[in-house]
């Protein structure tokens, strides 16, 4: 990317357009639409060319939805991505930790709301950048609980039934007794279900696929994230390291700033962990151009909204 293109990116970030595509005006809702369903896509060619420029998707790997589509209908080899999720740290192929999360819950990408993607990205940064370990499933279970998001719907007899939301039906919440860098995110991301597009799948290392084939099945009820006694003993050194990170004053904002400051997609498979990061020429970066602190702060503000978040220690 040229300096001129980077300047344009920074200008768009300041206006909040590049960082918050999910907040665009939505068309009339489709007949029969219920809370959590997909919305007709509002993604444009310009949006996807911008992702290509920034290295977040591969050149000529994407396809816009067909006119009149109200929900995704992917072709062979395609997967359904969302701008809201790409801007919060997901790109193909998925990081082994994130793929493990998806396999554990039998989940699709759209089952996770944008805030869940932001929390997962922050967790990967916490582990690789601040603790110095690969993202650890046991530590994740120590910190977070999983929860299902349900909606009420009238059946044919007029009785109310509960359904898990198709989009955003699976989220995560910090356990009350767990130590974790403070991070408050926007309560909701308006119209994020309209930010979908198609992208050719990219296989994970030593695998034949990246994301699972797209499905419109609703998520399964969230499984409990409980630790066994053996797991509690095994992760205690990591818990101690986490407590020390929090004691030093590291916040969730610090974690998010790594994502854009280093231009790394934490939920994308990489050839090395973040503790081996070497600078602007590092192979894990989506782009070698560095962004200003003002641009990074603007992006973080789009993710956190009006929520008050503590500031981390000065460097």
Which residues are covered by each model-predicted region?
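Residue-register detector that marks a fixed positional context within folded domains
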Residues: 1-315
């Amino acid at each position: 990317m040229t300096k001129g293109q980077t300047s344009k990116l920074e200008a768009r970030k300041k206006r909040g357009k590049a960082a918050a595509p999910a907040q665009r005006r939505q068309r009339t809702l489709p007949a029969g639409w219920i809370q959590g369903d997909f919305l007709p896509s509002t993604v444009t060619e310009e949006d996807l060319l911008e992702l290509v420029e920034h290295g977040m998707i591969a050149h000529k790997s994407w396809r816009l939805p067909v006119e009149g589509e109200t929900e995704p209908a992917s072709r062979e080899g395609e997967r359904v991505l969302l701008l809201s999720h790409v801007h919060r740290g997901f790109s193909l192929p998925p990081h082994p930790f994130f793929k493990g999360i998806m396999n554990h819950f039998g989940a699709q990408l759209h089952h996770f709301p944008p805030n869940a993607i932001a929390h997962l990205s922050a967790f990967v940064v916490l582990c690789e950048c601040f603790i110095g370990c690969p993202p650890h499933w046991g530590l994740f279970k120590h910190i977070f609980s999983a929860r299902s998001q349900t909606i009420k719907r009238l059946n044919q007899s007029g009785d109310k039934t509960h359904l898990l939301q198709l989009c955003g039906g699976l989220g995560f919440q910090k356990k009350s007794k767990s130590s974790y860098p403070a991070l408050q995110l926007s309560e909701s991301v308006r119209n994020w279900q309209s930010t979908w597009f198609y992208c050719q799948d990219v296989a994970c290392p030593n695998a034949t696929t990246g994301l699972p084939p797209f499905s419109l099945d609703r998520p399964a009820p969230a499984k409990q994230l409980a630790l066994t006694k053996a797991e509690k003993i095994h992760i205690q050194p990591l818990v101690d390291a986490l407590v020390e990170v929090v004691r030093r004053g590291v916040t969730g904002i610090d974690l998010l700033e790594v994502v854009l400051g280093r231009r790394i997609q934490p939920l994308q498979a990489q050839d090395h962990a973040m503790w081996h990061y070497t600078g602007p020429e590092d192979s894990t970066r989506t782009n070698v151009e560095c962004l200003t602190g003002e641009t990074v702060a603007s992006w973080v503000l789009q993710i956190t909204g009006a929520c008050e978040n503590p500031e981390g220690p000065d460097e």
